[in-house]
Amino acid sequence: MLDKFNPQLIEDQLYLESEPFFKAALKSSATPYAIMMPPPNVTGSLHLGHALTYTLQDILIRFKRATGFDALWQPGTDHAGIATQLVVERQLNEQNQTRHDLGRDAFLEKVWQWKEYSGNAIVAQQRRLRISADWDRSRFTMDEGLSKAVVEVFVKLYKENLIYRDKRLVNWDPKLLTAVSDIEVVIKDEKKPFWHIRYPLADNPNQHVIIATTRPETMFGDTAVAVHPEDERYQEFIGKYILQPITGRKIPIIADEYCDMEKGTGAVKITPAHDFNDYEIGNRHNLERLNILDDHAHLNEAVPQQYQGLYYLKARKMVVADLEEQGFIDKIEEMIGASHYGERSGIEVQPYLTDQWYVNAKALAKPAIDAVKSGDICFVPKHWENTYFEWLNNIQPWCISRQIWWGHQIPTWFGPDGEIFVEKTEEEAYAVARTQLGSDVVLRRETDVLDTWFSSALWPFTTLGWPDQTAELKRYYPTDTLVTGFDIIFFWVARMIMMGMHFMKAVPFKTVYIHALVRDEKGQKMSKSKGNVIDPLILMDKYGSDVLRFTLAALAAPGRDIKLGESRVEGYRNFCTKIWNAARFLEMNECQFDAEFFPSTNAHPIDQWMTAHILELKRTTINHLNEYRFDLAAQGLYQSFWYIFCDQYLEALKTLLLSDHATTTKKVAMWALFEYLSLLHPIMPSITSHLAKYFKMHECLTNYKLCTKNTQLEQTQTDILWRLIDEVRSLKGLLNISGGLMLQACLVTPEGEFDAYKDVLKSMARFSSLGAWNSDCPPDGFYLPCVVGGFTLFVCFDEALDKASAKNILQQKQEALEKEILHLDKKLQNQAYKNAKPEQWQEDYELLELKKSESQKLSNFFKFF
């Protein structure tokens, strides 16, 4: 073996050798288990959120394979409509071209070329994590099969009256000239002016209602002013009219409970065509929707001529100046308010009234709600169900059209008078048009494409071959587990459930595991502007994929964000080193693996104890992974390997290898190492596979099946051994004595009992001699006792220090402990502290109990002075 573990030297070759075992076995008799990988954008680059979700999914897939399931992990990529189009458009801009210069077909050809040569970089980065997806089954949301399925779904939903065309408000990006989804909008809190504007009453222009707004240019789209029906200030005005400043247009004063009497002046300008809340109020009161912007966010012909054609920000300045000049400004305040920016364009998006295609999401939501309420789908952690229900119970029509070119072009054709024909093909559309209109007409194809989330919502069944009834679809649908982040519960998870329930009449998955957000070590969200982004590719270059994977798994506590700094990763790099060094130690001591060997009651008691511990560790690890407690599984394996196997068992091994049990002990040690490797493999596939192959344990751990056994093995006295050793070390520490100093000791025990452990105790506790003693009183000299489970070990300190010095040391430590106890006791009696910080209070309480126990232990020593 190499002196040090070098992941760069082994990972690539091991991964290639393992790939044949990543495939699902369609004709297997094993129980199927399936995970659909959330498809990353083809424009994407691997970030820590990706690394976390892929690591957790891979742990599940490898674990299920190892426990006998036929595991399918379906990979693929998303065409990422707007993002991909922008990448190619930027390339064209560098050549002083636009997509319009090329035309739609030529531009799309360019995009496909880009996708072919550059669009799969994210897949190569995924593979750097050594994840075991069934790569040969990889799908793309715009490949031929999925495109066919998307058309099928759109046409069916339209003919079921669940898709329709409507003029509604959308998030409009004036730079990209398309509607965008809420998730593509970045909300920033910014300081902005809050203009208080006087709106004169129509029947008494000397009286006015003051309206506060941050967007005075939209006043030309006002079609009402609203007040709360219980606001006493405005009772006399409800039902009257006011005059819009500058234009003098009459608009009504209405009552609506949406108005907040405590905010601003309590009176709100209602602009249904340019504000989402106003749009709903307008619907309730049947108000006109007056659009005053064009698609570039310039004011249109619906406003006074002097403002027409002005960009909205320039128009805002001009409107404010005119309002001030005409005496309509009451005052100007500064406030902190939310501004909405396009994630990709960087400019402010506008609520904009435009014709779009919509899904009647409310009709699809009820079965999706029922699926979770009934327990057919479970969220882990469970509290995320509340978020899911909140969104679906308040669901709005889903805008599925985008005004771009890259994507699934909507299968709709328009007739000469606006007739709509939704069919799977152009030929079918013309045939239906000919039948309905009675003559041949020229149809115009809809230019809009579908929202990327539309095709993604079909991912669990279209990737398995739907609408064809394939063997894969029958075997692997419904899938089992979805692993994803909380931010797309609505945008993706809920929509997959809606579509699965509608088209498959069954849930798309049984469990939704929502993982945490990866933050920096201070708990702050990572962002380029803060300069605190950690690149997983750089971490893997430096430490290897196993270290990053194990770090993420160990920190993946449910419901708690991950605080990640490079120091954490370095710490788990040491764990890899520990595994490597343990394996080298066994090799140096000529331990060899025997595939037919299983430890028995004939083995040394310490070997039996190690065996029993591993069998219990295997059971708990399997339980943790079945319950999605990746953190407990990883931490349990870490603690066990480092402290039980290395610090205890391998240290004892140095003595056992000199005993009559040496041959069996070597086999037990290698059996134990293999069991650790097989349990660690789902989390750390590279180092475990390498060592298993090197020691001829198993050709490929990816194909190894975990199994559990029940056996009665000795454990009790071995536990006492470790506790005695710990007590000796602790006592040396109390007296400020070097742990390596050799001392004399004697053990009070019946003759013959504990003999199997004495050599190990002598070696690991650093005794120059270990005799037998048959009295509860120590021999002559300066002895202090270590008492564990009915066994008393007297340790002689004559060679280390005199009694007076030892007593003085212990008294000083006792006094310091008493001060800590008094301080903690006083702190815990503060009821306000307990109420304000219950978790911290509990930690302090447990610390107090520990300190009291330490104090009692010290007190017991004084009787020996």
How would you describe each model-predicted region?
Residues 78, 174, 180-186, 414, ...:
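Acidic, turn-prone loop/beta-hairpin segments
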